[in-house]
Amino acid sequence: MIETDRLIAPSTQGTQEEALECALRPKVLDEYVGQEKARGQLEIFINAARGRSEALDHVLLFGPPGLGKTTLAHIIAKEMGVNMRQTSGPVLERAGDLAALLTNLEPNDVLFIDEIHRLSPVVEEILYPAMEDYRLDIMIGEGPAARSVRLDLPPFTLVGATTRAGMLTNPLRDRFGIVSRLEFYTADELARIVHRSAGLLEVAIQQEGALEIARRSRGTPRIANRLLRRVRDYAQVKSDGVVSADIADAALKMLDVDKLGFDVMDRKLLLAVLEKFDGGPVGLDNLAAAIGEERDTIEDVLEPYLIQQGYLMRTPRGRIATQQAYQHFGLAIPGKIGTGELWQQ
């Protein structure tokens, strides 16, 4: 199974969705919903830098995919009144790739590097003096004739985004003056996002319909917008085009997205632990064989949300289903779950 095959995958699904995301993206901080802490901090730092006519300090945005890191980078550039250049860590293979971007920046411009944890060590070394002293040290020539040339750069702001902050090297992380973690959104925040997107897409939606979509969106705006588009199609064909709670519920049931935002693969994994392995503990290899998936798919794609929501636990002895998992599927809870015996292994 490929993650992007799932309707509730937090990653972008193709260029068409990227284009639609761009159209739905808020342009300024006042339009940005949620992330109150990060938004409040950025508003102060942006206003201060703008008042001094300086470049904003370098910004690191980290958190799960689909929460608005790229959107915030665009907003930072817009609020600062400067241009933004966008790239990603895997694309910057050589020092020259980064040098070409840096030397074409105007004063106070924003350089956005997505997946910054995937920068090569060679490129990262070039980035250090650029971030710290606004200078670029590059080697010209090879062998004994090689020489270092220093280029002065205009002041700029590097905005780095990553889903894996732990993979950043300490020297790189320490060079960011502003570090913001993006959290999963509440259902109310997502309902506001769904309402805003529905307005831009010219979709008639009721408050309860927006909430129904929000509750199943796994705390992620990207998923909420994707589900909205699918529910819109259902409402257009099966009803009068208005997205009510009943229409949203019927559409999402048809799409196999349940009340918790679980899809077929989530339920398959949980039921395997519950029914085939008596709730666990079960080793990862056995679980992978039982549901016909790769170990990496379970660890990187399926498990994180189930663990974060409290339906699955990782222990030294293996995976264990929690009381919530039994309750979700209407199964009797074994006595051992409530005794704490499993947690003490």
UniProtKB/Swiss-Prot annotation:
One GO MF term on file is: four-way junction helicase activity
Quote the record's binding site residues for ATP: 24-25, 66, 69-71, 132-134, 175, 185, 222
GO terms of biological process kind: DNA recombination; DNA repair
EC number in record? 3.6.4.-
Residues annotated to bind DNA:
295, 314, 319
Top EC class for this record: hydrolase
Q: Write out the annotated subcellular location.
A: Cytoplasm
- Keyword Nucleotide-binding recorded: yes
What are the alphabetically sorted keywords of the record? ATP-binding, Cytoplasm, DNA damage, DNA recombination, DNA repair, DNA-binding, Hydrolase, Nucleotide-binding
Q: What does this protein do?
A: The RuvA-RuvB-RuvC complex processes Holliday junction (HJ) DNA during genetic recombination and DNA repair, while the RuvA-RuvB complex plays an important role in the rescue of blocked DNA replication forks via replication fork reversal (RFR). RuvA specifically binds to HJ cruciform DNA, conferring on it an open structure. The RuvB hexamer acts as an ATP-dependent pump, pulling dsDNA into and through the RuvAB complex. RuvB forms 2 homohexamers on either side of HJ DNA bound by 1 or 2 RuvA tetramers; 4 subunits per hexamer contact DNA at a time.
HAMAP family given in the database record: DNA_HJ_migration_RuvB
Q: Which family does it belong to?
A: Belongs to the RuvB family.
Name-wise, this protein is: Holliday junction branch migration complex subunit RuvB
User: Which organism does this record belong to?
Assistant: Methylobacillus flagellatus (strain ATCC 51484 / DSM 6875 / VKM B-1610 / KT)
